[in-house]
């Protein structure tokens, strides 16, 4: 009985350590993903700003011939 209890306590301690390590990993990944989202947003904005659209606005469009 005593050996079983010691084994369970050992497993619990190992699981607690593993959970803490996984938590740290998940937190680090979340921070990295936030940085990557910010970089992607900035790059998207820069790309849109550097490449003007070839589609004219409705004000610039000439009306179709049937008008």
From Swiss-Prot:
Entry's InterPro entries? SlyX
Q: Which residues form the signal peptide?
A: none
Q: List the disulfide bonds.
A: none
Polar residues: which segments have biased composition? 50-60
The region called Disordered is annotated at 47-67
Q: Which NCBIfam families match?
A: PRK02793.1 (NF002750)
User: Member of which family?
Assistant: Belongs to the SlyX family.
Q: What is the name attached to this protein's record?
A: Protein SlyX
Q: Which organism is it from?
A: Salmonella paratyphi A (strain ATCC 9150 / SARB42)
